[in-house]
Amino acid sequence: MTCYKLSRRRDLFAFPYPLTVWRDPPRSVEVVRDFVESYDIRHIYTVGDVVTRNFLEYGLAPTSVAVDEKTRRGIKVEGLGLYKRVIRVNNPPGYITEEAWAAVEEAVEGGVLIKVDGEEDMLSLAFIKLAPPRSVVAYGHYLGALVAIPVDWYRDSILRLFNYLEQCQQKA
């Protein structure tokens, strides 16, 4: 099993990696849809309530999603019944716990809703590392942009962020 804790250089994790769309929905989702269609992307994974809601609302259903059901805007995500399997995990802020990592391992197969008690933000890294070829991982940037990572192009570069995480010990 794998567990990581953000220990330093939090600033690197706030960087808006490509493809960053500084448009409100539905336009932001349309940009990602165009990208997905143009590059024959087969899998889309969303991390975060607002991004997941926008993708579902504007007709771009993700393969699997991770949400914590808490947003600064008080938004409720509709349409989560689309996902056949629900996995509940504990994941404190700044962590990717063993159980969250295991949930992402299942989620990359498709049809999974990960409900996080804590914070889901760091799970984007697990999705980027574990996603199959022709995948995009999408999440919201704290300044309001939609970030979509085509993993085939950026996986190696983004995985260097693991150098700034420390492995954590958890009780089984």
From Swiss-Prot:
Keywords: Coenzyme A biosynthesis, GTP-binding, Kinase, Nucleotide-binding, Transferase. GTP binds at residues 49-51, 68, 70, 120. It catalyses: 3'-dephospho-CoA + GTP = GDP + CoA + H(+). Its EC number is 2.7.1.237. GO terms for molecular function: GTP binding; kinase activity. It is an enzyme of class 2 (transferase). One of its GO terms (biological process) is coenzyme A biosynthetic process. Pathway: Cofactor biosynthesis; coenzyme A biosynthesis. InterPro entries: GTP-dep_dephospho-CoA_kin (IPR007164). Pfam families: DUF359. Catalyzes the GTP-dependent phosphorylation of the 3'-hydroxyl group of dephosphocoenzyme A to form coenzyme A (CoA). Belongs to the GTP-dependent DPCK family. This is GTP-dependent dephospho-CoA kinase.
